[in-house]
């Protein structure tokens, strides 16, 4: 119920304040500080998390990262299950998502703007193209991440989510999607900011060539936090890690 959700949100907020007091005044003991991130399916968000965690003694912390549905990213940060969420805005979804963020008492912080890319297997028939148009993709399965039976197009992680595709396959995780790219010659439309260290070198991001009916949309990637909240030390380090990775790895991607 709405009352139950609101109670859970305030309970977590109070507990978070309690944890902050314990962290500040406790000496020794076995208390573990907690930090969580919820994100759309971005390998760069996971890589930034890995780089951040390596700076800490993991025996003193309880870390969590959740690659999940867009609605869950928003819900997790709103209920303080995660301190930071990572998602994108576009001309298509901006108004709807900002309304959802506002109602959840969250705010969006800009990280980077990028165009959409076609992400596919290195041995895909279109792998040698300089750019790929919508018509060239027609004969191949379009892959997308599941967002739930009742989700709207605005929660999709891919651009052109309202288009009619002759063949579509949905996946719930990145590993399955990569397998589908190989097994079905499938593709997805994504930011093009891919962490090869995590996804492997068998996949390519090729510029998507938009046309009048199927325009390439700017994707504004950012992170969300609770409104008027102050990021913890770990939260600030994670955001810094995100910014550093994006600065170092978007020259070739854009």
Task: Name each region found by the language model.
Residues 45-51, 94, 133-163, 192, ...:
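Secondary-structure junction motif
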Residues 69, 78-83, 147-204:
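Hydrophobic hinge/microswitch elements
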Residues 16, 23, 28-76, 232-235:
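N-terminal winged-helix
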Residues 119-127, 220-231:
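A bilobed periplasmic-binding-protein/Venus flytrap-type ligand-binding module shared by bacterial periplasmic
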Residues 9, 50-55, 71-115, 120:
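Short beta-strand-centered segments that line the small-molecule binding cleft or hinge
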Residues 1-17:
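Basic, amphipathic "hinge/linker" alpha-helix immediately C-terminal to the N-terminal HTH DNA-binding motif
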Residues 29, 100-142:
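Flexible hinge/capping segments at coil-to-helix
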Residues 102-109, 114, 175-228:
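Beta-alpha-beta core module
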């Amino acid at each position: 119920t709405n009352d139950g959700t609101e109670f859970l949100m305030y309970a977590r907020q109070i507990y978070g304040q309690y944890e902050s007091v314990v962290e500040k005044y406790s000496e020794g003991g076995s208390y573990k500080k907690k930090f969580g991130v919820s994100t759309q399916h971005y390998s760069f968000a996971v890589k930034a998390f890995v780089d951040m965690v390596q700076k800490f003694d993991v025996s003193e912390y309880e870390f969590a990262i959740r690659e999940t549905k867009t609605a869950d990213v928003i819900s997790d940060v709103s209920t303080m299950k995660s301190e930071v969420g990572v998602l994108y805005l576009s001309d298509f979804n901006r108004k709807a998502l900002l309304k959802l963020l506002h109602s959840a008492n969250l705010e969006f912080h800009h990280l980077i703007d990028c165009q959409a890319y076609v992400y596919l297997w290195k041995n895909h028939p279109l792998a040698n193209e300089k750019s790929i148009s919508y018509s060239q993709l027609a004969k191949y399965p379009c892959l997308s991440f599941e967002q739930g039976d009742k989700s709207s197009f605005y929660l999709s992680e891919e651009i052109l989510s309202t288009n009619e595709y002759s063949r579509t396959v949905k996946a719930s995780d990145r590993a399955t999607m990569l397998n589908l790219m190989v097994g079905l010659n499938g593709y997805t439309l994504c930011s093009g900011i891919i962490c090869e260290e995590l996804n492997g070198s068998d996949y390519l991001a090729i510029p998507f060539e938009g046309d009048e009916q199927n325009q390439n949309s700017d994707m504004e990637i950012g992170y969300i936090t609770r409104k008027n909240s102050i990021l913890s030390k770990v939260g600030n380090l994670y955001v810094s890690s995100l910014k550093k990775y994006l600065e170092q790895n978007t020259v070739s991607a854009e």
